[in-house]
């Protein structure tokens, strides 16, 4: 009888031991690099792109670092040429383990460093391209059940992004409601620029953000409701051009160039058709 019990214990122990060995191996750098290359190869085949990763590092329990991520796609008009969809110098993801067991996500750090991107034809509505020095998010309150996100801190630094809207987008008849609610305690943007172009370059808007701070934001994506407690934009600039409109002397509403722009807003609220805010500071040169 004891012999049978021993064999039963051994049979139960073998898969447990093998699982523990596998877990330990996943924290060995050579195994990590081998595994990530296999995953990148599989993703490349499924997505029809070339995805490569230079190096990966996983520290117990879920502190992940990835270096040298490149995503290439064949050019849709020139044979033999590829477009770089993304080139990311480093990705850091530090996620707490225990909250995952209760369907919650707590992210101590999710950051992307030295990013260059070009969505090419992946997004029909627009082409987004540019570079980002740092994108950092800390979130200790993502609840997958209640569809709520609490962002403790978000930072964007050294970004230069352009968005070119398309005029050939078919109507989307498959839209589904989005019920997520997002709270943002603190948002910081430094040394960044954003350019928006409408189809056929009929309008261009360029925004320069040397320093922008926003606090206590709330965004209900289902109701399209957006609130901010405070927003401060310091020493920025704004260019607005109706490209095909002739220029006129004096204040030209079709061609506006604001510099040394300082803007302070309290209690911003927007939920169509209602817009409310307290304008604390507004100063600029034109």
Could you say what each language-model-derived stretch is?
Residues 127, 168-172, 246-252:
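Flexible, surface-exposed loop regions and adjacent strand-edge segments
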